[in-house]
């Protein structure tokens, strides 16, 4: 059983909290400490963003985080080194890399999958790789025991959901809003209806992200979803903090979110 599958099994119906931060933001030396801070606050799974120069699915907050990381020359190899360092003290919390296809292509899917597995990565979510084009990547990841996590949007047709159901492992990430990360306001009832429909096609846990900025919204989403994903709000916290206070502030915010979804 993968670490992700084991995480959901151990939750036994309780809801998972999946925080997102960008590797290398605000600087590379702080990322591993922040990851441990997320766990201290109650994170069940960590989504770790791979910095990219053209993060088209991300709003201004996460775009700025990528820019800060890229100023420090943080690339995919550095991100894998950070995961390996995190694993020296944490062998249980699943880590999912979230990013774009180009850096994986540049490394080569098989080489990437091998290095990711060795580092202690558990899953990979590429926001710009549709299921129709994912077979080669999914095959490389699966051969190394890594889960392929897919996005499902409000506009995803049932035919594409069916394709995702064949390839996805670990969990599925439902994008609760049209547009970029950190934007808009959620229609909780609509999200609940969409998740109920998706459950007819998807056998995996469903996490919901985009637009979850506070404990009240997290609690409302958790009533319908298996996991709550929070990214922009946490990255915003990092942006506003000093390097000395960032971990403590993240831990506090994650603890508030975790308490809300229990």
From Swiss-Prot:
Q: Which GO terms describe its molecular function?
A: tryptophan synthase activity
- What are the catalytic residues? 47, 58
Q: Which UniProt keywords apply?
A: Amino-acid biosynthesis, Aromatic amino acid biosynthesis, Lyase, Tryptophan biosynthesis
PROSITE patterns in the cross-refs:
TRP_SYNTHASE_ALPHA
Q: Its annotated pathway?
A: Amino-acid biosynthesis; L-tryptophan biosynthesis; L-tryptophan from chorismate: step 5/5
Statement: the UniProt record of this protein carries the keyword Hydrolase: no
Gene3D superfamilies, alphabetically?
Answer: Aldolase class I
Q: Give me the Gene Ontology terms describing cellular component.
A: cytosol
What's the superkingdom here?
A: Bacteria
Q: What chemistry does it catalyse, as a reaction equation?
A: (1S,2R)-1-C-(indol-3-yl)glycerol 3-phosphate + L-serine = D-glyceraldehyde 3-phosphate + L-tryptophan + H2O
Family under the similarity heading: Belongs to the TrpA family.
- Subunit structure and binding partners: Tetramer of two alpha and two beta chains.
Q: What does this protein do?
A: The alpha subunit is responsible for the aldol cleavage of indoleglycerol phosphate to indole and glyceraldehyde 3-phosphate.
Protein name according to UniProt: Tryptophan synthase alpha chain
Q: Which organism is it from?
A: Chromobacterium violaceum (strain ATCC 12472 / DSM 30191 / JCM 1249 / CCUG 213 / NBRC 12614 / NCIMB 9131 / NCTC 9757 / MK)
